[in-house]
Amino acid sequence: MRAKNWLRYLKNFTLNKFTSKKIPYSAQIELTIRCNASCPFCSFPMMEENAISREMSTQQVKSIIDQISQLGVNSLSFTGGEPTLRSDLPELIHHAGVKHDLMIGVATNGYLMPKLFKENGKLNGLDYLLLSLDYPFKEQHDRTRGIKVFDRVMETIKLANQRDIKVILSTVVMKENFKYLREICELAESLNCSIEIFPCENIIRDFPNKRYIVKNVDNLIPDLSMWASTIDYLRKDFKNILTDPISVAVVQRGGFGGYPKYNQEILRCHVAEAYLFVRYDGFIDFPCKIHPIKSFNALKLPLSKIYNSLEAREIMNKHDDFEFCEECRLGCAIASSMPARWKTLASKFIMGYLRGNLK
C-alpha cells in the first residue's frame, strides 16, 4: 500500500472515530453479473438475462467513480461476475487509479487477464489482483471452475509480477480441496503471491423479486474448527497468508449475528458504513449486497446524499443485529469491517503489511 493511502486511511479513521462525519474506507463496483465460469458455490450462472442487460454504461461507471473519489474513499475494487468481460475495464482502471489516485483492485478468475495485459501494457492505475485459485493442480482447479483457467492464472501471475502489480490468491476452502492447503500455500509462496484462505459459504443473493440460492452448498463447507486450526498452523510456516487470527476467530465462533447475545464479541459487522457497494445496475444496497433491505439508485441520486441519508445511517447503526446476519462468515464482510476498529485493523492490515503481504 502506498504511503498516501495510509495517510488517507488515517484521516478517514479519525473522522469516523471522533466526529459525526462518516466516510467509507473502501468501495466496490460490481461491473457485471455475467461470468465465464461455473463454480459450484456461486449463484451468478443462475442469473436471468434481463438482469444482465441492465449493466451501467462506461460513462455511468465513471460518474460513480468520480463521486466515490469526492466522498473521500481510499480504495476501490472492480468485481463481478467476472469484471474482465467488460471491454472498458482498462479505461475504468485508468480513470479510477490514475485520474483519481484511488488504490485499485480487480477480483478475477484470471481467464482473460493475460489478454488484457498483452493488449494494454501495464494497465496503469491497477495496484493488485484478487485471483481465484482453489487447487494447486490444473485438472482439479479447472474442473471446479468449469473452464480451463489454471494455465491462464499462472500466466496472469507472471505478467503481474513483471508489472509490479500485487497478486493476492483467493482460495475458497471446500471439503475436497482442504487437504491441499499446504500445497496451495507453497505454490503461492513460490509465485510471490499473498493468499487469502476462507471457507466456502452458503451465499443467498436477494433481489427485489427473486432470491438466488445454490443447492447443496452445505455439502461443500469444511469443518470450521479444522479449518481454523489448519490456518493457525500454516501461518507459522507461511508469511504470505493474509487470513489473520482475528478473522479466523470470528469465523470459528459463529460469524456475525446472534443478536442480542451475538455469536462472538470480537467484531461487529461494519459493512454498511465501511464498504460502499455499487451494484451492476447502479443501485446501492444497504446493509449489504447479499441481503438488501434498502436500495438507492445512484444513477439518479448523488452518492453523498445516499450514504449520509437518515435511512442508511439507521441501518449502519444496527450493524449485524438483523436476523439474516446470523452466522454470516463471509470473508469479504469480515475484511471490510476490520478497518473500522484499531485492534482489527492492526491484525489484518498492519501486520499484513509488516509481513510483506500488502506492499
What are these regions (language model features)?
Residues 45, 79, 132, 198, ...:
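Conserved residues at the C-terminal ends of beta-strands
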Residues 61, 227, 303-306:
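Hydrophobic/aromatic residues in well-formed alpha-helices
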